[in-house]
Curated annotation (Swiss-Prot):
Name of the encoding gene: uvrC
HAMAP family on file: UvrC (MF_00203)
Subcellular compartments: Cytoplasm
Every UVR domain range: 204-239
GO MF assignments: DNA binding; excinuclease ABC activity
Gene Ontology BP terms: nucleotide-excision repair; SOS response
A Pfam family the protein falls into: UvrC_RNaseH_dom
Keywords recorded for this protein, A-Z: Cytoplasm, DNA damage, DNA excision, DNA repair, Excision nuclease, SOS response
CDD domains on file: GIY-YIG_UvrC_Cho (cd10434)
Gene3D superfamilies, A to Z: 5' to 3' exonuclease, C-terminal subdomain (1.10.150.20), GIY-YIG endonuclease (3.40.1440.10), UVR domain (4.10.860.10), UvrC, RNAse H endonuclease domain (3.30.420.340)
Name used for this protein in its record: UvrABC system protein C
Organism: Escherichia coli O1:K1 / APEC
UniProt-listed InterPro entries: GIY-YIG_endonuc (IPR000305), GIY-YIG_endonuc_sf (IPR035901), GIY-YIG_UvrC_Cho (IPR047296), Hlx-hairpin-Hlx_DNA-bd_motif (IPR003583), RuvA_2-like (IPR010994), UVR_dom (IPR001943), UVR_dom_sf (IPR036876), UvrABC_protein_C (IPR050066)
SUPFAM superfamilies, A to Z: C-terminal UvrC-binding domain of UvrB, GIY-YIG endonuclease, RuvA domain 2-like
Amino acid sequence: MSDQFDAKAFLKTVTSQPGVYRMYDAGGTVIYVGKAKDLKKRLSSYFRSNLASRKTEALVAQIQQIDVTVTHTETEALLLEHNYIKLYQPRYNVLLRDDKSYPFIFLSGDTHPRLAMHRGAKHAKGEYFGPFPNGYAVRETLALLQKIFPIRQCENSVYRNRSRPCLQYQIGRCLGPCVEGLVSEEEYAQQVEYVRLFLSGKDDQVLTQLISRMETASQNLEFEEAARIRDQIQAVRRVTEKQFVSNTGDDLDVIGVAFDAGMACVHVLFIRQGKVLGSRSYFPKVPGSTELSEVVETFVGQFYLQGSQMRTLPGEILLDFNLSDKTLLADSLSELAGRKINVQTKPRGDRARYLKLARTNAATALTSKLSQQSTVHQRLTALASVLKLPEVKRMECFDISHTMGEQTVASCVVFDANGPLRAEYRRYNITGITPGDDYAAMNQVLRRRYGKAIDDSKIPDVILIDGGKGQLAQAKNVFAELDVSWDKNHPLLLGVAKGADRKAGLETLFFEPEGEGFSLPPDSPALHVIQHIRDESHDHAIGGHRKKRAKVKNTSSLETIEGIGPKRRQMLLKYMGGLQGLRNASVEEIAKVPGISQGLAEKIFWSLKH
């Protein structure tokens, strides 16, 4: 404990009410956030002669100040604790790294409803189904639904401005409600109802209704219609046969935990209406000497209480670990949801099977992560040996991408001891250079990246320059001219030139722009990590360049038309669903866009056609 912090004097002022406490180090940084039913009793436990763990000893040794916030109830304290953890990201708390909102399938409340993926606050009128573990699961489900139930998935701006059906109608993936006369209101509403039932887990009702309609069509000698409905029945059956469905039809989140070598994996199964919508593995940041019980309790609290605005709470949460605050957590979640939420740790039947599945997935994911981490460590150790460095904790790599010198983008990717650190990847739009001058582009991005103050922990051990001797010379010149407070001589600048025919394993490495380079054996672990970070940088640069090129492509042809400024250009693209939709539109359709007169519509039409 810090000599400046008087624990006895502080504890005399602390109340015995519930609340939250924040501990600060000498630099004024919050290093730990906790809650307590009795603040005085809880805080006194930190200053006993025999502390519970090495982690607590290390924490107490750094305490310079403690702030206390009193709350009315223990539930309020729990909510406030997790809000503070999210805000301060204290180093001694278990931290949930991923706090993104989860995607849902959205069925709009329009006259002709559409299906779409939705993330974030649920302001739009309609129905939301989910949550799904990631965007891929939603897109896969939407593609499947489109094959079985052909209701529209287009944006309203496209739907409102069509005079003829699109390709989705031609291939049987949409009933074409945008064009009058293609589908009756009753038929479209029936397909929407099938989607609603299907996403609610009521597959049997969908099949019963479809079979009844098929039999009616057959009796009325409408054999083509009966055959179409038969195909739809078969499609529904194919999908439902592949799913493991619980007989209960409940909404559950099932949480399994694995813990090994100081790393934890928490695996969450999302079950809605008895169907497994998917699952996701999380690897929370765990301070050294942390007990598994703290990992589980903190993760569960952060997972539900920090993201409650964006996350639909299930009726029941299954855990394979006993929580000391289980009742408090259940009460807090019930209060947030406005309904009863159960937290169960000893389920039976199907629920026990789900829990076993989550536990197995957590163990498998953790084993894979540890193996991957071990491989990265081995490769970085090998690289440090090759480069004659004590260690390599952080690497950064740069690449340049452009098309014939236009829309130049530079990328910087970062690797740490665990591999790619994607949260710190950056793209830089390069301007003010001669088109196609890669050397000037590299010079600019390095100055922008390193010509400023950098935290000591962010100074790379190795900076990899993709491009060989010329680009390495630019990097050397930039670093020689840098006037910065951090140690600019710490990073090792390493150039890498692609091999003949750009084949992997034939790269040449350079420490200096002059003289001969050297190569590593194709099976060298050091070469593998160089190839990995270089490929990541290349892909990241190309991705940014493509986005920039697409943006220019979508706007450049409109920018040449007199009378079309940024606002009108944006309105045209929005209402027509992009430049291609605008090219295919008639004068009358263009004139329907707000702010576009008949005369301007004709000018736009002829400009795009010629």
